[in-house]
Structure formats: structure tokens, C-alpha cells
């Protein structure tokens, strides 16, 4: 048997599969326990396979933890070392990829030319002297050199010096990507360094849970492009798990609806909602690399658009902006009070009909984990006092302000939340679903009390308030889906993010237009994945003319997709030269051989592509490869491009081959 697990920001889902019969035996779902992932994984394994030991041969995992860490910027402090770059470069181009000039960046002397030759030798003793002090302010490091994909000498030498100075994670750009754009490689290395401890904690939790149950299966992880990799490979390159969860959800949608050929897939999670396109039964891939929030990576992933909207998104009401969505995930009030009876009693006694309570009385903060001695000493007096106060019981924002005498200034709660010390709890769509009876997992009475409070402040009744929130969700998902289809149209791609398109979408979603009605239609079906899909996807479909599908077991679609992937590796080798000699090289520019005849060059290129793809395939944990090598002829352009042809090698195997 095999198990597929998806650990999301809010829920952890699982499926138990009979490998021989290719049959789903059982599904399970449990809240993700961020303070200790072993708890939710243990619960899930107990639900799926109550007996210890057993014949679990394979465990495949997908997770949104890396993606959510990027979206919510819950990182450790990473020092970025750049060779061949300047502060002006970062000011001019860094923002476009998510890197801004900051004290966290060190511009090292030394550099390479575009052929990979050393054009400026660094003063390594001086570099080491700088690093002795500079490295003390960081938890991890990323090292990237311009043209470093052609020559790794600068990155690897710097890594060795840092390694001798400190025992902290160090990642080089050359270890992750051969992308020409060094800033995109810098983003990859920067994120990989920060995600390493997050992913290591996740994997350790999984293996400990399995070991306690006497289970020792083969483990693999879903990559952002929908293929899978071994546990060892994933630990080295956790950045490749970015969009792992969304990729698995699309694979799950395809598996649950085998007849589906063309679709817009919306995965509604707890933290984000993701939209992707399935065309001719295959998932569209973004070859330029995954973009997560402001970060443009060079990691290939599914072509996806993400909105910070999920079941655990905060609903904010204020006089300036009215009802709108908060930033990041919060703990639904209906779920939080289940753990804290005192807060449940507080809501039960709250008189929302006659009391003049500020909105801050319904926003709570709970202690998530205590800071260590070093981190605790770095907190200011108010932050330390907040930690001490929350040890006893969660406190409302209003109570904290009264306690510390800060009527309007920041209490440092944002810092405490970002670093995982406290957890915010507020009204969310999950609470609204409790009130309407569409989803019951927590305390409905608390959700109802909170809704009455918010509705009163908005000048409406509770039922109208809930209906308004549902429409806000449906409209945002509708706009996300239509924009995804617009970006897929080559003639419209350039204007997809324009203000005019936004106004057009706002107009089409309007239900009180007097003179004109606009309704988009498409041959692509609308498919929903995720626990709330059955609630919201039909509402989204009402806004435009498409068929709507929510497959059975949509609530565990990610876990289904996790167990159905394949290991896939690719390698491309180029031949350059419109006449002899012919140069054979990797796409990154690394030279392989110079040949006097085109026939010899093609033989060398084919062999090199096969060798390269198998090397990467086995690194990812593949077995029994099926290898294909394809030649693509290109017409060389004199004086502009000497590219003659490209040999593309592919090696693949099914995930189930790993246990055969």
C-alpha cells in the first residue's frame, strides 16, 4: 500500500492507496499543528492506518509550507553574498525579482567574464576578515556570482571560508540552477537557505511519526512542476518544493476527473487560493520559473496564479476601508476557543447588542512558542511583557493595549507573529462557514457572536453580512480565474495586469449594471479542489458562462495528486557554429567539446545529453529510467546567433517504480 500526504498551512490531508488495484481505500483530514508537526502527522497516520507496522511501501508528500513561508515572509535572517554585482545593480534590477538593496547583502570583490574566466581575483584573506564579523548577524547564507553557472570557483571558495567560520546553512547559486539571470539564481539560493530548516523540521517530523509506528517506507516529495524527487534530494533543494501543494492539487484534479481535458483549476486552501490551467490533459508549466509573491525564482513550476485568500484569511472592518481582507493567515475564532475555554466563556458573556466594544476586542493573540534565551533577550520590554501575559491565556488586542498603555502605537505584535512566537486569531471565512452551517469543526456559537458584532458595525444583520463575505470570496476567485485565462491568450498577455482589465472585471462582476451586462465564456471547465470548493466554485461559475465541476474527494485532492506523480529529469546540450569548428556545450554555457565535423558534434551532443539527464535522474531518486533523446534543428542567424541545434534528453519513471 501507499500513502499520499499534503501538509498545508491549515490542514493536513491524506489518502491510503492500494497499489496493485490502484484503488483509494481511505481519506483523512486534520488541522496542521505548526507548533509540532508530528502531532498532525500522527493523527493522520492513525486515521489512515490504525495498525502499527504494516505494508506501507511508499509515502509521497506535497506541502504548501515553503510557499506559505514566502508569502507570509516567515524567514530566518539570511546573508546574501554577491560577486560581480554592485549596490546600483540591485537598486536598478533587484526589486523586479524580490531582492532589494539592504544591509543583508554583501558585495564581494572579484568577478568572472561572460565566458566564465576569472577577470578579477578576490582578496580572499580580506574577504575572510570581513566575514568573521559580518556572518555573526545571520542564521544562514546564500552565495551567488554573476556568470557563476559557467565557473563555480568564486562561490565554492567563499562557501569554504564561511564554512570554516561558522556552523550555519550555506547555499551556492551554482548548486541549484544554471539560469543565466544571476539575480534569479540569487533568489533561488536566498530562499533555499531560509527554507532548509523549515523543510528539515517537516521531514524529521514525518520520519519520527513513521518510526514510532514501525513504518519505514520509501519517501518522495512533489516538486513545484508536479514531478517528484527523493527525500535526500529534497532536503538539499527545498526551494523546489515551492508550489508543491498547488502542483499536487492539479494532479489530483486530473486524476479525479480522468475525462477532463481542458480546465481552469481553483484550489481553495486555508492560506491561499491558487488557479492553474490544464490543457489537453496536461498541466501548463511556467518555464521562466515560479513567482511567489515578490520573489521571481528560476525553479520551473506549474503556471499558477495565487491570491492571499483562504479559509483562514482575516476579515477586517474599519471606517476607512470598509470590509476587506487582512494579510496572512490567522486562527479562526471558532477554532481557537476550542483550545482555550476561558476565551470561549469571554465570547459567551460578550453583549454585542448593547455593549460599546471596539473591534480590537474581537482580535486575539495566543502564545505559539516561547523564544529561546538569546532571542528572548533581544525583545524589548513590551514584547517580553506580552509573552509573559500570553502564557496564562490569549488576550484581545484591546486588552493588550490597555495593559501596556499604548492606545495607538505598535506593540511589537507583528514582529512576534512573524517570528512564530504568537499567533493571531480573528474572524475568517471559516467562521462564516460555521455560521451558515456549511462547515462545522469548531464552536459555532462563538462564530455567530463575532458575526453579529461585525454586522452591527457594518450596519446590517448577520445573515446579510455572511452573504456579503461569500460574494466577496466568489468575486475574488472569479477575477483570479478570468485573469488566468487572459494571461494564457498571447494577444492579451501584455494587458492582463492593466487597470483597464481590472475595471472590466469589476464591471462584469457587478449585479446592478443598468445599461450593459458583460459575461465571459470559455471552453475550459471550472474545476474546484479543496474543502470549501463545493461551497464557492458554483458561485464563481455564476459570474461567467462555463461548466462547473467539483470532483468526489475534492477535499483531499492534493494528497491524491501527491501519490500519482513521476520522476522526470531533462538535459539540453547545444551545438554552435554555422560552419566548422562546432562547439558542443550545456545550455548554461559550460563547454563540453569542440568538433571538426557536424556529424561528430551531433554524436557528442547526443551522448552528453543522455549522460547528463541520467545523472540528474538518479540524483532525484529515479529507478528504471525510460530515456528519450530528441534533436531540435535551428536555423542559425549569421552575425547574431550561431546556434545550430539542441539535443534534448528526458528520463522518467513512475513513482510506483520506486518500490517495484
Task: Describe the role of every protein-language-model region.
Residues 1-660:
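N-terminally biased helix-coil "hinge/interface" segments that flank
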Amino acid at each position: 500500500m501507499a500513502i499520499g500526504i499534503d501538509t498545508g498551512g491549515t490542514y493536513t490531508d491524506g489518502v491510503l492507496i492500494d497499489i496493485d488495484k490502484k484503488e483509494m481505500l481511505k481519506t483523512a483530514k486534520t488541522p496542521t499543528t505548526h507548533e509540532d508537526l508530528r502531532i498532525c502527522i500522527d493523527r493522520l497516520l492513525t486515521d489512515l492506518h490504525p495498525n502499527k507496522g504494516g505494508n506501507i511501501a511508499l509515502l509521497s508528500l506535497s506541502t504548501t509550507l515553503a510557499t506559505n513561508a514566502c508569502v507570509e515572509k516567515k524567514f530566518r535572517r539570511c546573508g546574501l553574498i554577491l560577486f560581480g554585482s554592485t549596490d546600483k545593480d540591485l537598486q536598478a534590477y533587484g526589486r523586479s525579482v524580490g531582492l532589494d538593496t539592504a544591509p543583508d547583502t554583501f558585495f564581494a570583490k572579484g568577478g568572472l567574464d561572460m565566458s566564465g574566466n576569472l577577470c578579477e581575483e578576490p582578496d580572499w584573506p580580506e574577504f575572510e576578515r570581513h566575514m568573521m564579523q559580518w556572518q555573526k548577524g545571520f542564521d544562514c547564507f546564500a552565495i551567488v556570482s554573476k556568470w557563476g553557472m559557467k565557473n563555480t570557483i568564486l562561490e565554492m571558495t567563499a562557501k569554504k571560508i564561511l564554512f570554516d567560520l561558522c556552523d550555519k546553512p550555506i547555499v551556492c547559486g551554482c548548486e541549484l540552477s544554471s539560469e543565466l539571470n544571476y539575480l534569479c539564481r540569487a533568489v533561488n539560493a536566498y530562499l533555499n537557505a531560509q527554507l532548509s530548516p523549515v523543510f528539515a523540521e517537516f521531514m524529521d517530523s514525518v520520519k519520527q511519526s513513521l518510526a514510532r509506528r514501525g513504518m519505514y517506507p520509501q519517501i518522495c516529495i512533489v516538486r513545484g512542476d508536479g514531478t517528484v524527487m527523493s527525500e535526500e534530494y529534497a532536503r538539499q533543494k527545498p526551494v523546489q518544493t515551492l508550489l508543491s501543494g498547488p502542483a499536487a492539487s492539479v494532479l489530483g484534479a486530473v486524476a479525479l476527473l480522468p475525462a477532463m481535458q481542458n480546465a481552469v483549476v481553483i484550489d481553495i486552501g486555508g492560506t491561499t487560493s491558487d488557479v492553474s490551467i490544464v490543457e489537453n490533459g496536461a498541466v501548463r508549466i511556467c518555464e521562466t520559473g515560479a513567482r511567489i509573491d515578490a520573489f521571481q525564482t528560476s525553479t520551473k513550476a506549474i503556471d499558477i496564479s495565487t491570491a492571499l485568500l483562504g479559509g483562514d484569511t482575516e476579515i477586517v472592518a474599519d471606517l476607512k476601508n470598509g470590509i476587506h481582507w487582512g494579510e496572512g493567515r490567522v486562527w479562526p475564532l471558532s477554532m481557537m476557543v476550542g483550545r482555550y475555554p476561558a476565551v470561549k466563556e469571554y465570547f459567551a458573556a460578550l453583549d454585542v447588542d448593547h455593549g460599546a466594544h471596539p473591534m480590537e476586542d474581537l482580535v486575539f493573540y495566543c502564545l505559539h512558542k516561547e523564544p529561546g534565551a538569546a532571542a528572548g533577550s533581544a525583545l524589548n520590554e513590551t514584547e517580553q511583557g506580552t509573552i509573559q501575559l500570553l502564557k496564562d491565556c490569549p488576550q484581545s488586542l484591546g486588552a493588550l493595549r490597555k495593559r501596556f498603555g499604548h492606545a495607538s502605537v505598535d506593540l511589537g505584535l507583528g514582529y512576534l507573529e512573524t517570528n512564530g512566537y504568537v499567533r493571531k486569531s480573528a474572524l475568517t471565512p471559516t467562521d462564516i462557514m460555521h455560521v451558515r452551517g456549511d462547515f462545522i469543526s469548531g464552536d459555532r456559537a462563538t462564530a455567530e457572536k463575532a458575526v453579529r458584532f461585525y454586522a452591527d458595525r457594518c450596519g446590517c444583520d448577520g445573515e446579510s453580512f455572511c452573504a456579503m463575505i461569500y460574494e466577496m470570496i466568489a468575486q475574488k476567485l472569479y477575477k483570479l480565474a478570468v485573469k488566468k485565462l487572459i494571461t494564457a491568450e498571447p494577444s492579451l498577455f501584455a494587458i492582463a495586469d492593466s487597470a483597464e482589465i481590472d475595471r472590466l472585471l469589476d464591471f462584469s462582476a457587478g449585479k446592478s449594471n443598468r445599461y450593459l451586462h458583460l459575461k465571459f465564456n470559455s471552453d475550459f471547465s471550472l474545476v474546484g479542489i479543496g474543502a470549501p470548493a463545493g461551497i464557492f466554485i458554483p458561485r464563481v461559475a455564476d459570474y461567467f458562462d462555463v461548466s462547473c465541476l467539483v470532483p468526489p474527494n475534492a477535499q483531499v485532492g492534493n494528497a491524491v495528486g501527491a501519490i500519482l506523480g513521476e520522476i522526470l529529469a531533462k538535459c539540453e546540450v547545444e551545438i554552435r557554429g554555422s560552419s566548422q569548428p562546432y562547439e558542443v556545450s550545456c545550455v548554461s554555457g559550460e563547454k563540453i567539446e569542440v568538433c571538426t565535423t557536424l556529424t561528430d558534434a551531433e554524436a557528442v551532443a547526443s551522448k552528453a545529453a543522455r549522460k547528463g539527464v541520467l545523472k540528474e535522474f538518479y540524483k532525484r531518486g529515479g529507478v528504471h529510467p525510460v530515456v528519450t533523446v530528441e534533436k531540435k534543428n535551428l536555423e542559425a542567424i549569421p552575425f547574431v546567433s550561431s546556434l545550430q541545434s539542441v539535443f534534448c534528453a528526458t528520463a522518467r519513471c513512475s513513482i510506483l517504480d520506486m518500490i517495484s
